[in-house]
C-alpha cells in the first residue's frame, strides 16, 4: 500500500462523473441519515501474452530438430562400422604370418575388438546429443523471449474506493474552529480559494475549484431525482460545499477534523519540515496542503450536504520556493565595483555542493576569433580574475623568425657610471664669491703681552700710537760673566740701526706709490705714560711689510678679472698702507727724542 499510495488519489483531470456510486443504507432517513459515496476507478495492468500460432511453430521446430538428430546418428554408426571392419582384416593378415604360439593372443584381441565395436554401435557419443539439444533449446528460448518482449496484454479493472484528493497549497482564512454539539466537541477548518498567495499555483487552485463545483452539481441532481422514490421531504435543499461570505471575499470550503473524546484527533499534522506536530500550529492566514476525503452525504429535515473529512495536513512557509531561494543568499552583484565578492561566494558555495569541480571553457571557446596559427589574447571576465582556471590552456610553441640577409649587430659600448653631483648642490658663481669677500670684516693683529699706548700729537698734527717695548731678551751665554753691560749696549745699537734702515726703505716705497695722497689719522689709542725703554720696532715693521706685499700681489691678480668694485677695494687697501707708514714716521720721532 505504501508503494502505491498515489493509486488512492483521484486524478482531477481524468475525473469521470458517471463513475460516482451512491450507496443507500438500510432504513435510510428513518434510522440513519448518512448516504455513502464511492468512485469506480479504472486500473490498467499489462501482462505478457503467448499466441497459439507461436505454440504450433514451436512443435514444428521440435520435430525437425529430432529428425535431423536421428539422421546424423545413423550416418555416424555406418562410418564407425566400416572403419572397424577394415582394421580387423588388416590385423588378421598380420597374425597369419606370425607363429602359432601367438594364436591365443590374436583370438583375445579379436574378441576385444568386436566387443568394443558393438558397444560403440549401441551407445553413440553423448556429447553430440547434449550439444544438439542445447542448440535447439537456446534457439527456442530466444524465440520465446522475442515473442514475450514484443507483445503485452492490457487488462482494465475497476476498483471501488472513496473520493480522495490532495489539495494544492491554500490559505486557512479563519484558523481552526471549535463547535459544541450536545456535549460533543467538533472541529472544523476552512480552505480559501484565494489566489493572492504568491505561490504560483493559480491554475491548480482553479482546477480544484472546478472539481468541487462539479461534485456539488452531481450530488444535487442525483438526490433531487430520487427524492420521491426515497420518500424524502419535499422542502429538502442542498447546501453546497463552496461557501462565500459576500461578494467581496473568495469562496472557501469547510473540512471536518475528526475528533474522539478518548483518542483525540484522528489525523496527523506535520510542520514545515515534515515532522509530526499538533493542530495548534495551524493559525489564521497560515498556508497548508491537505488530503481530504468525500466521506458521505449528511441529511437533515431541511437540507443535506457533502461531508469532507481531513485525513492529513501539512503546514508550509508563507512564500514560494522561488522566493525562499532568493532569501538564502545575495544574488545582486555590483558590476561597477571590481572588489565585490558576492559572485565569488556563490561560486564557492555551488562548488561545495557538486561532486565534481566545475570545468571552465577553454580560451578558444571563450574567444572564437582566434587564428589557426596561434591563440589570440583571451577575454577575461570581471569575475574570472578572482578564480584560477583549473586546467590552463597549452599554447603552441613559437620559434623566432630570422631574415634571409641579417645585418651584423654591433655590441654597444659599456656605459661607464657617471658620478653626478647631488641634485641640491650647485657651485657658487663669481659674483657670489665677490659679495662674500665684502662681508669679511678686517682683523687687527695683536701681540701677546703688549699693551696699547697713548696717541701723541706731533708738530705736524699727526697721531702716533705709542706701543710699549717688550721685555728685554735673555742674556747671551758667554764665558765672561763680567761684561753684561757690553752685550746690552751692542743689542741696542743693532736694533736702532735696523729700525732706521727699514723705516727709510718703507717711506721711500710709499712715497713713490702715492705721492699726491695725504696721510690719514689712525684711530688707535695710546697709553698715558710713555715708557723709557726701547721698543722692538724692527719686528713690527717687518710684519707690516709682509702684509703690504701680499695685499699688493692679490690686488694685481683680481684687477684683471673683477670690475669697478674691485678697484675700490684696492684703493682702500692703499689707504691702510699709508696709515701704517705714518705710524712708522711717528715712531722714529719718538725714538730720536728719547736719545
Swiss-Prot record:
Compositional bias annotation for Acidic residues: 137-146, 544-553
Chain intervals with Pro residues compositional bias: 410-420, 467-476
Bias (Basic residues): 559-570, 581-595
Spans annotated as Disordered: 50-159, 398-430, 450-595
Record's compositionally biased regions (Low complexity): 83-122, 398-409, 421-430, 477-529, 571-580
Composition-biased stretches (Basic and acidic residues): 123-132, 454-463, 530-542
Disulfide bridge map: none
Highest rank taxon of the organism: Viruses
Protein name from the UniProt record: Uncharacterized protein L291
Organism: Acanthamoeba polyphaga mimivirus (APMV)
Phylogenetic placement of the source organism: Viruses, Varidnaviria, Bamfordvirae, Nucleocytoviricota, Megaviricetes
